[in-house]
Amino acid sequence: MTTLRLLSGGAAHGLVERIRPSFESRIGCTIDGTFSAVGAMRDRLLAGEPADVMILSRALIDALAKSGHVVPSSVTDVATVATAVAVRRGDPLPDVGTADALRTALAAADEIHFPDPAQATAGIHFAGVIKKLDLEEQVAGRVKLGANGATAMRALAASTAKRPVGCTQETEIRATAGVVLVAPLPPGCDLVTTYTAAVTTRSQAAAEASALVVALTITGK
């Protein structure tokens, strides 16, 4: 049986799991997926790790198409995901409906969990939000970075702090036990990321890989 190797941003994990049983049965293959920060997944492909399909942010997939690592004609948007605020399950939900309210909530938090800006789309953006809200120095000692969104949310769930908050892609929040989604980031601080799939140029199972991209597209929409 063919095994399809997938390297994907963590935000697409739930989408892949939704289609996995029916796709594997229908196509007669298995999906071997790794999910983490989009930058880390790109780096693994560039380092030579075998992969048949990539799911990353649109900008990273476009760059891989330009560099010859994915097939340009296979590039397909599969989902859009908002970056959102989270708290531990059972904690009060802070008001984050405006930029000023978000600033107040972050200033009151004793821990702020989000993915590493060096690798993750949500992390890059949220670090910029903190700077935009002029909180960079004030909260520097409270920032807790995870290798990816899922790791950051698990750390938030396990936190023993009094008022921790977190931020990552909404799909990663929903997929993590022990945390709840408060709301997407407010206007002026918001981010909606387009996740895009593509077949790699080194794929040894191009037909099956293309079928996976199609299945993801149908389910994502």
What kind of region is each of these model predictions?
Residues 52-53:
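Phosphopantetheine-dependent thiolation modules in NRPS/PKS and related acyl-activating systems
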Residues 1-34, 39, 43, 47, ...:
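Exported/periplasmic ABC-transporter solute-binding proteins
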